[in-house]
């Protein structure tokens, strides 16, 4: 599915992994129900809660041209305690 762009791995999101919360950047037009259904079907997990926010715009200069990068929505997904996403497991 092209609505889920990629997982986000920052210091904060790595701390969230301990609470069984995972962070993804998704398409701005994607709804919570679409993303929830896709996560449950693709990873075979049970989603308990979802939080979303849109990070603020930031200006980007390329030479003399000033513009804005493509907008996205960030989803923080909480799973049931007995589920995990194998993509984020450490070995």
From Swiss-Prot:
The keyword Amino-acid biosynthesis does not apply. Its main location: plastid. The keyword Phosphoprotein does not apply. Keywords: Chloroplast, Plastid, Ribonucleoprotein, Ribosomal protein, RNA-binding, rRNA-binding. GO terms for biological process: translation. GO terms for molecular function: rRNA binding; structural constituent of ribosome. It holds the Pfam family Ribosomal_L23. It is found in: Plastid, Chloroplast. GO terms for cellular component: chloroplast; ribonucleoprotein complex; ribosome. Belongs to the universal ribosomal protein uL23 family. Part of the 50S ribosomal subunit. Binds to 23S rRNA. This is Large ribosomal subunit protein uL23c.
């Amino acid at each position: 599915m092209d609505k889920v762009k990629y997982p986000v791995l920052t210091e904060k999101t790595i701390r969230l992994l301990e609470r069984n919360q995972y962070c993804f950047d998704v398409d701005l037009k994607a709804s919570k129900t679409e993303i929830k259904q896709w996560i449950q079907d693709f990873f075979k997990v049970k989603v308990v809660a979802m939080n979303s926010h849109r990070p603020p715009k930031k200006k980007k200069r390329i030479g003399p041209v000033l513009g804005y990068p493509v907008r996205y929505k960030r989803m923080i997904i909480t799973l049931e305690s007995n589920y995990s996403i194998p993509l984020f497991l450490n070995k």
